Amino acid sequence: MGKFDRYAFSAQPSFDEAATRKAFSKAIPLKTLVIYCYDPRAAEIPNAVAKLFGDEVFPGDIILDGSGNRVASTTTIFPVIVAGGRAVDALRSITVAQHLFGIQNIVVVHHSHCGATSFTADGIINAYEHEHRVDISKLYDRSNICISDYEASLKHDTALVRSHGGTPKNVNVFGYFYDIDTGTLTEVVRDVRRA
């Protein structure tokens, strides 16, 4: 038995995967997954999405049981924070969120003055090889490495999300540009499959 097994649901003798999954879906009412950049200036993006959508809760409250254990939350937004807010790095999280919670919306947000706009695909590949003596040119699809055109990158990322096998066909997919100075979200892509 591992040192931390008591914290893993699947390591418990009484583990029932179907029952655990059902409990997860009731404990946290997540319905919207928001993919955005790890730039600290972009930290307000989930709040902006919650405000824009109107029926979302973020960050919400943690619910404690009688023993003081953290057993649930009131948040409806699941943040996925990755470099440049690029969707390629969030695909597995989309599949897991759907499996555990049954999501309704996926929102991809790219923000103004993002560090991912400060280099090109060739630039980072060449610099990495020069500085670390490693060729990363085959590790990543060039269209997912940087942002040179916000509208094009949002259209690319939302299409990537929509076409991915781990994305439920009935979820809504949105792409927004976020101005970090004004806090304004501008819709670039709307692919609505459910009301």
Task: List the model feature ranges, each with a label.
Residues 40-79:
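Short, surface-exposed acidic-centric catalytic microdomains
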